[in-house]
């Protein structure tokens, strides 16, 4: 299998990389749909069960951003960041289950997520501040330093694509390799602590991606606060 983990979906449709990632992404979306459906089917004033879990998740996402950009802005951008966090979290979790592969272990998938964040926060920055003012901010506080600061800022922003995508990809890909070696070397009972560790890493990576997205958006829409 060329060093790849066995996957049930791969056994159905072949072990090509495109099929593996696409089929598991569709599975992720299906799981999220089921979760959302279960949580919103019978909404109650006092939440219970899956509604309680989903409301806690939404509240956690808002609290995460409130410290960075204030609660009002955090609520405004919660749908995007909450969606990204949920997709990344579920993707990471199905990768922990033997027989499935995390879409986030593919660089093309994580690069797509990073590009969504990059394009969106720059769009918000231009919309909020204007095209000229937004890029003028890249030149720094002193005009004499503009020829130096502008290319540095451009490179810094472009590097965020690499940072977001490769951090997530590297962590989850490493988890997959760790899981493969673990299952090859020891019986099924002994790897249980490893599964808990991989679960913790998956949650952590979803958190990091979400908080960085909040930080990047805050930096693009709150430039006037940085100047004071």
From Swiss-Prot:
The gene is atpB. Keywords: ATP synthesis, Cell inner membrane, Cell membrane, CF(0), Hydrogen ion transport, Ion transport, Membrane, Transmembrane, Transmembrane helix, Transport. The keyword rRNA-binding does not apply. HAMAP family: ATP_synth_a_bact (MF_01393). Belongs to the ATPase A chain family. Key component of the proton channel; it plays a direct role in the translocation of protons across the membrane. Pfam families: ATP-synt_A. F-type ATPases have 2 components, CF(1) - the catalytic core - and CF(0) - the membrane proton channel. CF(1) has five subunits: alpha(3), beta(3), gamma(1), delta(1), epsilon(1). CF(0) has three main subunits: a(1), b(2) and c(9-12). The alpha and beta chains form an alternating ring which encloses part of the gamma chain. CF(1) is attached to CF(0) by a central stalk formed by the gamma and epsilon chains, while a peripheral stalk is formed by the delta and b chains. One of its GO terms (molecular function) is proton-transporting ATP synthase activity, rotational mechanism. Its main location: membrane. This is ATP synthase subunit a. The chain crosses the membrane at residues 16-36, 45-65, 80-100, 106-126, 138-158, 178-198, 201-221. It comes from the Bacteria. GO terms for biological process: proton motive force-driven plasma membrane ATP synthesis. GO terms for cellular component: plasma membrane; proton-transporting ATP synthase complex. It comes from Aliarcobacter butzleri (strain RM4018). It is found in: Cell inner membrane. It is a multi-pass membrane protein.
